[in-house]
A protein has these predicted regions:
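Membrane-embedded transmembrane alpha-helical bundles that form the catalytic cores
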Residues: 1-158
Length: 158
């Protein structure tokens, strides 16, 4: 499988031009946004297609909890939604980035021999996780209004 990066010839001379051409041929912003979302998700799927579901799931969690924070009337409710969102999104990041490290250290510290899982790292997981976390925190702190459109939020994240 070809790895696609920004400096890859396939990206520069096929993927990017197709994205730009379709974007500028689109007549309205809704269609333009859909084109950008599709191309972003295709780009993310190039490494491992199954991880696009993780990106969409993480985005959906951020979107739902930001909306709940925005609609909540009490500070206690807002804080609860913020914490749940952080636990889920940072928890997913931790599972993918640090499970092997954690198991290796347990094996070194304790007289056990746990199998070290071979977990692939999703492309951009740190970037989009912190993008989501910062957005939800900004909604919590009233720095930004919660985005009411999931496609617009997904475009922001991806």
């Amino acid at each position: 499988m070809i790895k696609i990066v920004f400096s890859n010839l396939l990206f520069m001379f096929a993927f990017l031009p197709a994205n730009i051409i379709l974007y500028f041929l689109a007549r309205n912003f809704k269609v333009k946004n859909i084109i950008l979302i599709i191309f972003s998700l295709v780009f993310y799927s190039w490494g491992e297609p199954v991880f696009v579901a993780l990106l969409i799931f993480s985005s959906f969690i951020g979107y739902i909890f930001a909306m709940q924070i925005h609609k909540s009337e009490t500070e206690q409710q807002k804080k609860m939604y913020l914490i749940i969102s952080l636990i889920i999104n940072i928890g997913l990041l931790g599972i993918f980035k640090y499970t092997g490290f954690f198991v290796n250290n347990l094996n070194a510290l304790l007289p056990i021999d746990l199998p070290v899982p071979n977990i692939s790292l999703p492309i951009g997981i740190s970037f989009y996780t912190f993008q989501i976390v910062s957005y939800v925190a900004d909604v919590y702190c009233n720095r930004v209004k919660a985005q009411e459109s999931f496609p617009k939020f997904l475009m922001y994240v991806s």
